[in-house]
Amino acid sequence: MPLNLPDKLPAIELLKEENIFVIDNSRATQQDIRPLRIVILNLMPLKITTETDLVRLLSNTPLQVEISFMKIKSHTSKNTPIEHMKTFYTDFDKMREDRYDGMIITGAPVEQMDFEEVNYWDEITEIFDWARTHVTSTLYICWAAQAGLYHHYGIPKYALDKKMFGIFKHRTLLPLHPIFRGFDDEFYVPHSRHTEVRKEDILKVPELTLLSESDDSGVYMVVARGGREFFVTGHSEYSPLTLDTEYRRDVSKGLPIEIPRNYYVNDDPDKGPLVRWRGHANLLFSNWLNYFVYQETPYNIEDIR
C-alpha cells in the first residue's frame, strides 16, 4: 500500500525512480481510510538521505502510512538547507499534544560525547518520555538506541578501541519472535559506530529482552514493554553506498579509518559493495509496522496511552 508523504518532499521523486509507490498529501486525502501515523525524529546530519532510506523501508505496509518529521529546537542542522527544515519538519513543542501509531528515532554523530554533554539531551529525553504515552511503538536506531537504553534503563555505553565499521553477521536469539518473521537463521547488518552497549548489562535488567547479537559487533536488538520499545544498534536502513560514502569522506579528510569489513567485493573499494542486508532490512521494518504498530495500535488514535 502507498506511503503518504508531505507534498514535494525530495524523497518522493527519488523513490518513484525505484518504482516504490508513494503519494503526497493531496492525493491521500481522497482515500477514505485512517492511515497509520508515523513520526520520524531525524537526528542524522544528511537528513534528506536518511529520509529517503527510511521511507524506502516503510513502503511495504498493510495500510496507508502518513509520515511526519519532528525536529528539536535546541539544535540547528548544518548540513540540510534551512528551507527544507522549515517546509518538512515541525518542532516537538508543536507536536507534543499529538499521538502516533509509530515513531522512529535515528542515530546522531554525538556518540563519543557523554550523553549529558549533548546540547539537546534535556529535550530529547523529554521526547523519549513523551513517546511512552503518545506512541504505540518506538524504534530507536544506533545512537538513539544507546541513549534510550541509558535514559530508560540505566544501560551504559562503552568506547571501542576502533570504529565498528562494516557489514556483520547476526543471529536471532528468539527466532519465533514476530519481529523476526521470515528471517533466516543468520542475517547481515551494517554498523558504523565508535561505542557499544554490552550484553552483560542488558541481561541484568529484567524489563529488557536481548533478541539478536553478533560475534563481531555485539548486541544488535533489544525489546522492552512488550514491543512498545525496540532498540537497534545497527543501520539496517543504510542504502548500498552509505558506508562507501563514509569511508571515502574520512579518507579524504585524512582520518584514521579502515576499509569497512565484509562490504566491498574482495575488500576492494573500486569494485563496489556486495549488498547482503537489504532483504532483512525490509523484513525488519515491515514486521515492526505489521505486528507492533498496525496490530497493536487502537483504531481511535486518541486512545494511545
From Swiss-Prot:
One of its GO terms (biological process) is L-methionine biosynthetic process from homoserine via O-succinyl-L-homoserine and cystathionine. Pfam families: HTS. InterPro entries: Class_I_gatase-like (IPR029062), HST_MetA (IPR005697), MetA_family (IPR033752). GO terms for cellular component: cytoplasm. Pathway: Amino-acid biosynthesis; L-methionine biosynthesis via de novo pathway; O-acetyl-L-homoserine from L-homoserine: step 1/1. Substrate binds at K163, S192, R249. This is Homoserine O-acetyltransferase. It comes from Bacteroides fragilis (strain YCH46). The gene is metAA.
